[in-house]
């Protein structure tokens, strides 16, 4: 049980590691936060609520081995101190019910940038940053995640939707954004929608 929770945590932190040999030896370098767009005038109250994970791109993602993934949802609950309690809801493998993963995103000095709260709970994580790159708040968001774990830098971009389906144009925009950060087609995957768990 503890092992499966740890594996889930690593996946959601951007370490979607494949079973392929040498999957992390040649990671695409993570970009500096300064080179990643930041949503102007970020409005934390409008960003809160449920988002569906429509797409993922990252330097530990491999389409040729993962293909696609089952959609999950993430709920951002705004707190009085402008941090978010963030809950991701996933479908467990083999009809084992729903899985919930809760963490805290603490605002940094720039609106739309966050760090992981309670870092002591994640001893393998040396740093963890979240940056809202772009959003219209009511349809889509693209969020950049970067972490250092065991002296390796991982990054991912998540394409969120307020609904389970997004237009081909938004998916193409997401793909272009991921490639602008050095990722390739093989590092970009899209989810398969589900009605299990993620609307809870």
From Swiss-Prot:
Residue sites binding a carboxymycobactin per the record: 72-74, 147, 156, 160
Primary localisation category: secreted
Gene3D superfamilies, A to Z: 2.40.128.20
Q: Provide the residues annotated with a glycan attachment (glycosylation).
A: 81, 85
Q: Which UniProt keywords apply?
A: Apoptosis, Cytoplasmic vesicle, Disulfide bond, Glycoprotein, Immunity, Innate immunity, Ion transport, Iron, Iron transport, Pyrrolidone carboxylic acid, Secreted, Signal, Transport
Supply the Pfam families for this chain.
Lipocalin (PF00061)
Q: Which InterPro entries match?
A: Calycin (IPR012674), LCN2/LCN12 (IPR003087), Lipocalin (IPR002345), Lipocalin_CS (IPR022272), Lipocln_cytosolic_FA-bd_dom (IPR000566)
Induction / repression: Upon Toll-like receptor (TLRs) stimuli. By SV-40. By insulin.
Q: Name one GO molecular function term.
A: identical protein binding
Listed binding positions for enterobactin are: 128, 156
The record's note on what follows loss of this gene reads: Mice are normal with no visible phenotype. They however show an increased susceptibility to bacterial infections. Neutrophils show significantly less bacteriostatic activity.
Where in the chain are disulfide-linked cysteines found? 98-197
**Protein's GO biological process:** acute-phase response; cellular response to amyloid-beta; cellular response to hydrogen peroxide; cellular response to hypoxia; cellular response to increased oxygen levels; cellular response to interleukin-1; cellular response to interleukin-6; cellular response to lipopolysaccharide
CDD domains registered for this protein in UniProt: lipocalin_2-like (cd19457)
Alphabetical GO CC annotations of the entry are: cytoplasmic vesicle lumen; cytosol; extracellular region; extracellular space
- Modified residue Pyrrolidone carboxylic acid is at which positions? 21
What the entry says about post-translational processing? N-glycosylated.
The signal peptide, as residue positions, is 1-20
Found in which tissues?
A: Expressed in the cortical tubules of the kidney (at protein level). Also expressed in the medullary tubules of the kidney. Detected in lung, spleen, uterus, vagina and epididymis.
Subcellular location(s) of the protein: Secreted; Cytoplasmic granule lumen; Cytoplasmic vesicle lumen
Q: Which branch of life, at top level?
A: Eukaryota
Free-text function comment from the UniProt entry: Iron-trafficking protein involved in multiple processes such as apoptosis, innate immunity and renal development. Binds iron through association with 2,3-dihydroxybenzoic acid (2,3-DHBA), a siderophore that shares structural similarities with bacterial enterobactin, and delivers or removes iron from the cell, depending on the context. Iron-bound form (holo-24p3) is internalized following binding to the SLC22A17 (24p3R) receptor, leading to release of iron and subsequent increase of intracellular iron concentration.
Subunit structure of this chain's protein? Monomer. Homodimer; disulfide-linked. Heterodimer; disulfide-linked with MMP9.
PANTHER family under this entry?
LIPOCALIN, NEUTROPHIL GELATINASE-ASSOCIATED LIPOCALIN
Question: Can you tell me which family this protein belongs to?
Answer: Belongs to the calycin superfamily. Lipocalin family.
Name listed for the protein in its UniProt record: Neutrophil gelatinase-associated lipocalin
Q: Origin organism of this chain?
A: Mus musculus (Mouse)
- Gene from which the chain derives: Lcn2
């Amino acid at each position: 049980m503890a092992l499966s929770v740890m594996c889930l945590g690593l996946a959601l932190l951007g370490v979607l590691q494949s079973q392929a040999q040498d999957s992390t030896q040649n990671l695409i370098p993570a970009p500096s936060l300064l080179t990643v767009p930041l949503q102007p005038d970020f409005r934390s109250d409008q960003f809160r609520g449920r988002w569906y994970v429509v797409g993922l791109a990252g330097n530990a993602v491999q389409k040729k081995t993962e293909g696609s993934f089952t959609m999950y949802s993430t709920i951002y609950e705004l707190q009085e101190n402008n941090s978010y309690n963030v809950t991701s809801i996933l479908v467990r493998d083999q009809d084992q019910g729903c899985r919930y993963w809760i963490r805290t995103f603490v605002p940094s000095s720039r609106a739309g940038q966050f760090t992981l709260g309670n870092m002591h709970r994640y001893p393998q994580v040396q740093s963890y940053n979240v940056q809202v790159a772009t959003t219209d708040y009511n349809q889509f968001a693209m969020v950049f995640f970067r972490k250092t774990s065991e002296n390796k830098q991982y990054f991912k971009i998540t394409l969120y939707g307020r609904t389970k389906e997004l237009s081909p144009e938004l998916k193409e925009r997401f793909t272009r954004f991921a490639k602008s950060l050095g990722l390739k087609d093989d590092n970009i995957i899209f989810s398969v929608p589900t009605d299990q768990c993620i609307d809870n």
